[in-house]
Every structure is written in structure tokens, then in C-alpha cells.
Amino acid sequence: MKIIGDNLVPFKAFSKVTGIEDIKNTKPNSMIFFDFNEELLKYSFFQHLNFLVYVKSIKEAIYASNFNAKYIICENELAKKLQKIADNYMWDSKILTIIKSSDDLEKVALEEIDGAIYSDLLEIKVWKIF
């Protein structure tokens, strides 16, 4: 299970972007994060970028997977549904559910979700991911 944002687990820096200009201003080979956006998905795919994308629906997740998102981030109820779909279709993208503390890790593991990301990471400009 992947854990992103825990103090005990190292993780590589990533940046939140809202547009293509933001992406162009990131360091080469850096990981980027954005809310689902068709333009950013296409750009990231064709530029062969590593990215995380926040989705709100199964449809958005299907598109994110097809554009090779490294991680698809969503709320827990959606994550449970997406994990079954991802497993069935053998997506390369990993499903991450949003958690508030390490107390939530056992629940995520029992639900067999690929991983978890701490909510506080999604509220600031620069984060770390491994």
C-alpha cells in the first residue's frame, strides 16, 4: 500500500498546477498535481509527465487512467468503487484515497485500496511524494 504524506515514509516533492503555464514553470522531471482537467490531462500525457489527478467521478477516473496518471486521488467512497474497476481492467494508475491521519490507514488497507494521501498535502502549494 502506498502512503503519501506520512512523517515516517519518505516521499518525492510535487507541485499543484492549475494551467499549462504552471507546468512549464516546474522543474524538469518533477511530479505535478491537478484537479481533473481535460486540457492538463492531454498536455501531461503528450509531454510524458508524471502526475497525480484529483477526480470526482468514475468517468473522470477512466479518462485519467487512459492518459496515464500515476495516481488517481479521490474521496473514500469513490475510491472503493474505483479500486474494483482498476483491478478488473488492470490499470497502471494507482488509486489513492484521502485520509486525515494515520488512524485511517488500517481502514484503507482493509478496503484494499492501492494507497492513501494525507488531506493536508492537498491544501498547500508544494508537497512531497516518493
Predicted regions and their residues:
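Long alpha-helical, hydrophobic tracts
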Residues: 57-59, 69-71, 88
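Conserved N-terminal beta1-alpha1 strand-loop-helix module at the mouth
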Residues: 1-66
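Catalytic cores of alpha/beta
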Residues: 58-67, 100-115
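Glycan-processing catalytic domains of CAZymes
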Residues: 8-9, 108-130
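Glycine-rich beta-to-alpha transition loops that act as phosphate-gripper elements at the mouths
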Residues: 35, 52-58, 76, 95-104, ...
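Active-site-adjacent beta->alpha loops and helix N-cap segments on the catalytic face
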Residues: 31-46, 73-91, 103, 123-130
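Glycine-enriched alpha-helix->loop->beta-strand junction motifs that scaffold or abut catalytic
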Residues: 47-51, 67-72, 92, 110-117
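Solvent-exposed alpha-helices and their adjacent loops that cap or buttress functional pockets
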Residues: 25, 88-89, 109-110
